[in-house]
Amino acid sequence: MAAKEIKFSTEAREKMLRGVDILANAVKATLGPKGRNVVIERSFGAPRITKDGVSVAKEIELEDKFENMGAQMVREVASKTSDVAGDGTTTATVLAQAIVKEGAKAVTSGMNPMDLKRGIDLAVGAIVAELKANARKISNNSEIAQVGTISANGDAEIGRFLAEAMERVGNDGVITVEEAKTAETELEVVEGMQFDRGYLSPYFVTNADKMRVEFEDPYILIHEKKLSNLQSMLPVLEAVVQSSKPLLIIAEDVEGEALATLVVNKLRGGLKIAAVKAPGFGDRRKAMLEDIAILTAGTVISEDLGIKLESVTLDMLGRAKKVSIEKENTTIVDGSGAKSDIEGRVAQIRAQIEETTSDYDREKLQERLAKLAGGVAVIRVGGSTEVEVKEKKDRVDDALHATRAAVEEGILPGGGVALLRAVKALDNVETANGDQRVGVDIVRRAVEAPARQIAENAGAEGSVIVGKLREKSEFSYGWNAQTGEYGDLYAQGVIDPAKVVRTALQDAASIAGLLVTTEAMIAEKPRKDAPPPMPAGHGMDF
């Protein structure tokens, strides 16, 4: 086991604080509408330019191991805030730096670190309650657009696209962000349930110009196994022919004789029919077939349930207003499933999302949820160069998370003002002793840091701005860094999601509290006796 180096009390905290400052100073340059860019070297390809706090934090690794520990702890703040709220990473970093700085001073002057931490926790609890009480629910589309615009660093086009996407696919719908092949940013919305399986034979196509199968009001047969001959299906096929409605077959596979028979019947004009493979694999396939069945008010034909193909009747088949099948995907629009059944299934999937620990499973469950709950929107981000597209895509991702958070918990005035105003809740916090009161006061001073930093990044004097804001007591009165004007921030569209502000403060205080109560740090000693490099081989070239 390698020898370790240990640092104690003030020396440990000094080293740690230096690491915190290096990381936080790099990250906080990006805060606010006039925040600066950070350029990150890449081992291959062009450097990356970003204004995303968590992207900057993740790149920082320091040579000194003790400083690096401090930096990594604050990096954890940014990552945690990003995971929970999707935005607010820079605010969280600025708050953590402010609390650690003030806390370290108090500990050095002889305060009890544990009481300080208790005081910090009490203060954060009071401010969070105040923020929740003052959060305003989002009432219209323009407010969603404003949140998106603020989070995308003042890019109104991104805000507009996000608001339109959320309006069309609902708050639970999936919105994905991709890189476009062109210079323009565009929005594409797929309504209904779409899965990535196309027609099994091009002979099923009904619209030859677009190479697409289009059915109005079809029956949908959902079968779990392969279909290799149609003998067992004849009763249901005859019933469908008599109803003169189209039929879509979704099965694990349709092969050989069965596929040939379907194609021949289609070409002779006797049968409007198409077949596609079931989406997904293994257990996920079963779940997705069940989703389709619930959406279309059909039944999954499965031997596990004791249902045989021979005994299938028309009322076991699903129905939908429209089905469109292309080479690569199938879309079912307006299935006739009962609203209560679909809502029950959505609640079940939500519960699974809460319980799962795997990011991959969570992503797949969210896709299923969106397909049931409304649809999928794709924002394709365009730009002139690859570097520009990547930078813009970072901002769209941030803005997307921020708008979701705003819909969830409401909005607050932006620009760091909500935290400043919530400080009045600290007047009523009861503490057990003087050291805890100092902990509360640390938070009182620290919550000014985001507003100061936004002002400084915009070229103004932070202390002057904060002083002027303190003169007025209205909750939404603040300074707009974009225009340099004072006024009602709600009216000016300077708003932050309540969830983002709350999460940033809670995560910052949580990690900062741990750093303040640190008394010793242990790191591996650098080895001095490393072996010399191998000499070059002389006379060995054959």
Curated annotation (Swiss-Prot):
One of its GO terms (biological process) is protein refolding. One of its GO terms (cellular component) is cytoplasm. ATP binds at residues 30-33, 51, 87-91, 415, 496. InterPro entries: Chaperonin_Cpn60_CS, Cpn60/GroEL, Cpn60/GroEL/TCP-1, GroEL-like_apical_dom_sf, GROEL-like_equatorial_sf, TCP-1-like_intermed_sf. Its EC number is 5.6.1.7. It is found in: Cytoplasm. One of its GO terms (molecular function) is ATP-dependent protein folding chaperone. It catalyses: ATP + H2O + a folded polypeptide = ADP + phosphate + an unfolded polypeptide. Its main location: cytoplasm. It holds the Pfam family Cpn60_TCP1. It comes from the Bacteria. Keywords: ATP-binding, Chaperone, Cytoplasm, Isomerase, Nucleotide-binding, Plasmid. Belongs to the chaperonin (HSP60) family. Forms a cylinder of 14 subunits composed of two heptameric rings stacked back-to-back. Interacts with the co-chaperonin GroES. Together with its co-chaperonin GroES, plays an essential role in assisting protein folding. The GroEL-GroES system forms a nano-cage that allows encapsulation of the non-native substrate proteins and provides a physical environment optimized to promote and accelerate protein folding. This is Chaperonin GroEL 3. It comes from Rhizobium johnstonii (strain DSM 114642 / LMG 32736 / 3841). The gene is groEL3.
